[in-house]
């Protein structure tokens, strides 16, 4: 059985690119979210094996969404996606409970390496 993934990013092109990379590698993308609040709701509905989370999103940012998801499921596996220059936010996300991060723009191989590491 393939691992299930929830992809959360406010930019549709990023959600599509990440979903394509994961699907081609055999992962099952079970849902998408464009805000942190939506990410929390979809997490409750879908219980995915992994959440790919953008840091900067409208309504509720990725870091607050990580905190909410960790309250629901302390062992949730969350991989942050951040733009260059957001190191302080990445540290905050890891402290909130995220397992790892990748920096945009990224190579598909880097995405898959990080996903495998987080799911181990």
Task: Write out the residue ranges for each language-model feature.
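Short amphipathic alpha-helix used as the core "switch/output" element in two-component signaling
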Residues: 41, 63-75
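Active-site beta3 strand of CheY-like receiver
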Residues: 46-52
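C-terminal output helix
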Residues: 88, 106-115
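Receiver (REC) domain active-site loop signature in two-component systems and cognate sites
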Residues: 57
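Acidic catalytic/metal-coordinating carboxylates
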Residues: 35-38, 60-64
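Two-component/phosphorelay signaling modules centered on CheY-like receiver
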Residues: 12-31
């Amino acid at each position: 059985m393939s691992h299930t993934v929830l992809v959360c990013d406010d930019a549709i092109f990023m959600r599509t690119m990440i979903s394509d990379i994961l699907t081609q590698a055999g992962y099952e993308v079970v849902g998408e979210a464009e805000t942190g609040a939506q990410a929390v709701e979809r997490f409750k509905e879908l219980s995915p094996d992994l959440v790919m989370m953008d840091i900067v999103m409208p309504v509720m940012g990725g870091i607050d969404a990580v905190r909410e998801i960790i309250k629901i499921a302390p062992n949730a596996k969350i991989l942050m996606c951040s733009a260059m220059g957001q190191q302080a936010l990445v540290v905050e996300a890891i402290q909130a409970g995220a397992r790892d991060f990748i920096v945009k723009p990224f190579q598909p191989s880097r995405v898959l390496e990080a996903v495998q590491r987080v799911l181990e």
